[in-house]
């Protein structure tokens, strides 16, 4: 996916208060009764009132071609809530709605449009509260405590459908084919779209659309749907309904990056940090039985144990996957943390990244050239930095107004407590020694001759992930680092934002009147002993970056307060999330991958063994979305990410890239 800006909808409100697109000269919904039309055309056309009680799965997936004001989604959500209230014991428990929108409304226009339907206000207010910023790609919104999931894909639907991961094929139970009229917006109503709808439709899946245009009916038939006409709503004579009565062959565009889930719903997670905590919640929400094994005596004693950590995206003009992943991960993280029903110290005070030398300033200039939404990042001149941050630096930079800091240790502990209330079982001081397959399960051998058997296993134990035979060849490395805890001063107390330079400095935590400054960086090290050299270097880096700032020289590290941790990282700065790849089988099966691309087998992996690792120094930003991606994959549900970015998160990616070029691969 190429980077491009998302333009907001160009609309006006007519005399009836109905939003009208200036670009397409068409209304977003009927002036007469848009709500009843939605119920008739899309809910009735897909027979949802009948299908919900009979649905044999816990999740029902609906996809839509044009989100617009969200009327269809809100109406469906209301109907789904009414269904759940009337059928609390039904198999169907959750709703997943996927929609595409090229020109999203602003939050203000969305709220104005929603005033048309007071009866939808309880649902509309939740949507407005989480409405995402205009970034390309998928924005996942978790609504109604996770019972309703909305995937909003911003961009051109005909481009986006070709970039969806193969794992979404045959997942859609019902299609809402909506949008501006074909005569007004012919670019959307293409055979490419109809083919994509058929590819994504589950056998037995349905579709409904307000139009009865002949080319639409024929196009959908050519794609594989069985079509019929139905009486239209109100004054409209006819509309179209369809059903996918056949099972279409499944294409596989990049089998070497194929993601496989599990038919089982019982898992063990190995680790004790933020990755484990958030993944536990994501799996429990999907009905999994989850057990956590932590080698330590308490959670968050590893890399997730710091007092303060900065939350902001990692952006790069020259790395599309990195840019796409972290921008969407950051916005998801903010939505996720804001609705978490647990307390943890945090302050969304903003983060300012400073150009303290020529190289860092050039990097910031490149980031600012990407036409980023002001909600995500804005330029800040040197003379304005003091006003924004509270301290003088003599540097210009880039500010992330929705960034800030949080306490990872408190977050991890309290999320795990919440997960325990939802059924999570935790065993502390269980150090996993090895694991092996036994009777279609995984046998876990712990220190002290303890054993356990589980259907599915997720390795999320940070830098220790490569200590098993299945993972020893992974191209990850350890990074030891020390964060200094410094007492505040009158000048430091004025710091209003997190400062990032050749290190970082947080505003004081009201809980202890200390700041965090860090962190040292020792690649390949797992040493967690206090280092006086690192303590002094943390201070000196601050002074070197801001040599004219007297407040920097007054930073006091003499009390030797610090915390040392070890992170797990990769050379491309992206997490590793997905199936644990089988190194030996990969080398054998893909020995001639450069020549056999079209005939390549699916990626060799260990069955029911997954990993969640290499979060590096940005785990607070990446962990929430990674947990959602992995839980969705494991549950065989829609994944909130495009195929190319998902490939960049695949644990086998560094091997496959070399094999595709005919190059040799080395372990580690």
From Swiss-Prot:
Subcellular location: Cytoplasm
Cofactor(s) it depends on: FAD
Keyword Ribosomal protein carried by entry: no
NCBIfam families: MnmC_Cterm (TIGR03197), PRK01747.1-1 (NF002480), PRK01747.1-2 (NF002481), PRK01747.1-3 (NF002482), PRK01747.1-5 (NF002484), tRNA_MNMC2 (NF033855)
Any GO MF annotation of the entry: oxidoreductase activity, acting on the CH-NH group of donors
UniProt catalytic activity: 5-aminomethyl-2-thiouridine(34) in tRNA + S-adenosyl-L-methionine = 5-methylaminomethyl-2-thiouridine(34) in tRNA + S-adenosyl-L-homocysteine + H(+)
Protein's name in the database: tRNA 5-methylaminomethyl-2-thiouridine biosynthesis bifunctional protein MnmC
InterPro entries to which the protein is assigned, alphabetical: FAD-dep_OxRdtase, FAD/NAD-bd_sf, MnmC-like_methylTransf, SAM-dependent_MTases_sf, tRNA_MAMT_biosynth_bifunc_MnmC, tRNA_MNMC2, tRNA_S-uridine_synth_MnmC_C
Protein's job: Catalyzes the last two steps in the biosynthesis of 5-methylaminomethyl-2-thiouridine (mnm(5)s(2)U) at the wobble position (U34) in tRNA. Catalyzes the FAD-dependent demodification of cmnm(5)s(2)U34 to nm(5)s(2)U34, followed by the transfer of a methyl group from S-adenosyl-L-methionine to nm(5)s(2)U34, to form mnm(5)s(2)U34.
Family to which the UniProt record says this protein belongs: In the N-terminal section; belongs to the methyltransferase superfamily. tRNA (mnm(5)s(2)U34)-methyltransferase family. In the C-terminal section; belongs to the DAO family.
EC number(s) on file: 2.1.1.61, 1.5.-.-
Region named FAD-dependent cmnm(5)s(2)U34 oxidoreductase: 270-668
Region (tRNA (mnm(5)s(2)U34)-methyltransferase): 1-245
GO biological process: methylation; tRNA wobble uridine modification
GO cellular component: cytoplasm
Record keywords, A-Z: Cytoplasm, FAD, Flavoprotein, Methyltransferase, Multifunctional enzyme, Oxidoreductase, S-adenosyl-L-methionine, Transferase, tRNA processing
Main location: cytoplasm
């Amino acid at each position: 996916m190429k980077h491009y800006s998302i333009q907001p909808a160009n609309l006006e409100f007519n005399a009836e208060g109905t939003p009208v697109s200036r670009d397409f000269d068409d209304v977003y919904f009927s002036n007469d009764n848009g709500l009843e039309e939605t119920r008739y055309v899309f809910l009735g056309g897909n027979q949802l009132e009948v299908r919900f009680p009979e649905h044999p799965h816990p999740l029902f997936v609906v996809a839509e071609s044009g989100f617009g004001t969200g009327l269809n989604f809100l109406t469906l959500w209301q109907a789904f809530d009414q269904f759940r209230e009337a059928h609390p014991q039904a198999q169907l428990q959750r709703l997943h709605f996927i929609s595409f929108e090229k020109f999203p409304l602003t939050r203000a226009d969305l709220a104005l449009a929603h005033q048309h339907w007071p009866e939808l206000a309880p649902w509309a207010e939740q949507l407005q509260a989480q409405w995402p910023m205009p970034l390309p790609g998928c924005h996942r919104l978790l609504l109604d405590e996770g019972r309703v999931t909305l995937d909003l894909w911003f961009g051109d639907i005909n481009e986006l459908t070709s970039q969806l991961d193969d794992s979404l094929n045959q997942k859609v139970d019902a299609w809402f084919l909506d949008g501006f009229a074909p005569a007004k917006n012919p670019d959307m109503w293409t055979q490419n779209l109809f083919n994509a709808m058929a590819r994504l439709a589950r056998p037995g899946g349905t579709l409904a659309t307000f139009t009865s245009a002949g080319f639409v009916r024929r196009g959908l038939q050519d794609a594989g749907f069985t079509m019929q006409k139905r009486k239209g709503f109100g004054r409209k004579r006819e509309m179209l309904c369809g059903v996918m009565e056949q099972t279409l062959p499944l294409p596989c565009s990049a089998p070497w990056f194929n993601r496989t889930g599990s038919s089982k719903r019982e898992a063990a997670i190995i680790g004790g940090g933020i990755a484990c905590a958030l993944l536990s919640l994501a799996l429990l929400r999907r009905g999994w039985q989850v057990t956590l094994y932590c080698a330590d005596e308490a959670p968050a004693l590893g890399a997730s144990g710091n007092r303060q950590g900065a939350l902001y995206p990692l952006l790069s003009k020259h790395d599309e996957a990195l840019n796409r992943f972290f921008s969407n991960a950051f916005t998801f993280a903010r939505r996720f943390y804001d609705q978490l029903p647990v307390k943890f110290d945090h302050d969304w005070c903003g983060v300012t990244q400073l150009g303290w030398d020529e190289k860092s300033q050039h990097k910031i200039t490149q980031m600012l050239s990407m036409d980023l939404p002001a909600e995500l990042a804005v330029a800040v001149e040197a003379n304005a930095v003091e006003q924004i941050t509270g301290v003088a630096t003599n540097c210009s930079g880039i500010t992330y107004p929705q960034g800030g800091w949080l306490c990872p240790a408190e977050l991890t502990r309290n999320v795990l407590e919440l997960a325990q209330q939802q059924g999570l079982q935790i065993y502390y001081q269980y150090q996993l020694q090895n694991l092996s397959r036994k009777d279609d399960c995984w046998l876990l051998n712990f220190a002290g001759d303890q054993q356990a058997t589980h259907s599915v296993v997720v390795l999320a134990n940070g830098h220790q992930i490569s200590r098993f035979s299945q993972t020893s060849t992974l191209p990850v490395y350890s990074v030891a680092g020390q964060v200094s805890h410094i007492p505040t001063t009158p000048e430091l107390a004025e710091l209003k934002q997190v400062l990032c330079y050749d290190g970082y400095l947080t505003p004081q935590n009201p809980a202890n009147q200390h700041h965090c400054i860090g962190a040292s960086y020792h690649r390949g090290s797992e040493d967690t002993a206090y280092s006086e050299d690192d303590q002094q270097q943390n201070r000196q880096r601050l002074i070197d970056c801001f040599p004219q700032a007297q407040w920097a020289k007054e930073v006091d590290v003499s009390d030797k307060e610090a915390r040392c941790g070890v992170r797990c990282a990769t050379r491309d700065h992206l997490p590793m999330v997905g199936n644990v790849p089988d190194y030996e089988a990969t080398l054998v099966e893909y020995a001639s991958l450069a020549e056999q691309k079209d005939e390549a087998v699916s990626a060799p992996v260990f069955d029911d063994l997954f990993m969640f690792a290499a979060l590096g120094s940005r785990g607070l930003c990446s962990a929430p979305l990674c947990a959602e991606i992995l839980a969705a994959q494991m549950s065989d549900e829609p994944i909130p990410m495009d195929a190319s970015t998902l490939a960049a998160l695949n644990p086998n990616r560094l091997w496959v890239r070399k094999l595709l070029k005919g190059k040799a691969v080395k372990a580690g």
